[in-house]
């Protein structure tokens, strides 16, 4: 997998490509056309391919960037909103996945394989999402359980087994059920 850009000019191009790709993420993965994204972003196609060899790489990189931004917001909201921050962070991850079918398709299709370059991206995505939720919950186990719940609920919405409203309500309930566990972990950590 290509390295992340290191110079300010490269970072600017990289960001422009990701911003252009965000619109395609709202459609399906089959609608992600790197040539079209190159044109929209004003970045040469060869440069786009250098950073993102496939549409999968592009969509996973977009999601990684979104999670990175969310993690920063989670730090400030956890301090300001306490237990309510947990539901906010988890709900935001849920909505990112539901509202971006191309990203969700990549997450479903890509698997952890030793020699696949998307594996590194998937590891980064998992770490970022777990950290963002763990910051809000102060409990790594609760974070993993909630992220697995998000995955199941996204699939249920996609398969039309649940409405978006029903899935949101279930996710709020899961956060409420796990928030006392997280609050207890915080209290135990402070008293130790």
Locations of regions flagged by a protein language model:
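Short hydrophobic/aromatic patch on the recognition helix
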Residues: 41-52
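C-terminal peripheral helix-coil segments that are non-catalytic and often amphipathic
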Residues: 1, 130-137, 159-192
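Basic, helix-initiating cap at the start of DNA-binding domains
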Residues: 1-40, 57-60
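Amphipathic alpha-helical packing segments from all-alpha helical-bundle domains
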Residues: 88, 109-148, 166-176
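Alpha-helical DNA-contacting segments of helix-turn-helix folds
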Residues: 58-66, 120
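Short, basic, alpha-helical segments at the C-terminal edge of helix-turn-helix-like DNA-binding modules
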Residues: 34, 64-71
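Hydrophobic alpha-helical connector segments
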Residues: 61, 72-99, 123-124, 146
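Amphipathic alpha-helical segments used for helix-helix packing
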Residues: 91-119, 123, 148-159
């Amino acid at each position: 997998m290509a390295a992340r850009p290191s110079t300010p000019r490269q970072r600017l191009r990289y960001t422009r490509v990701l911003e252009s790709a965000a619109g395609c993420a709202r459609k399906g993965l089959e609608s992600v056309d790197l040539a079209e994204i190159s044109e929209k972003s004003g970045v040469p196609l060869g440069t786009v391919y250098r950073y993102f060899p496939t549409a999968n790489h592009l969509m996973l990189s977009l999601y990684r960037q979104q999670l990175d931004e969310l993690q920063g917001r989670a730090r400030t909201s956890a301090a300001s909103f306490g237990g309510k921050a947990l539901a906010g962070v988890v709900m935001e991850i849920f909505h990112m996945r539901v509202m971006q079918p191309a990203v969700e398709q990549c997450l479903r299709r890509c698997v952890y394989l030793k020699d696949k370059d998307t594996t590194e991206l998937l590891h980064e995505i998992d770490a970022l999402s777990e950290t963002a939720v763990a910051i809000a919950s102060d409990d790594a186990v609760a974070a993993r359980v909630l992220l697995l719940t998000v995955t199941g609920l996204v699939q249920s919405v996609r398969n039309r087994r649940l409405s978006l409203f029903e899935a949101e309500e279930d996710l709020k309930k899961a956060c409420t059920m796990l928030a006392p566990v997280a609050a207890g972990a915080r209290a135990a950590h402070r008293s130790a």
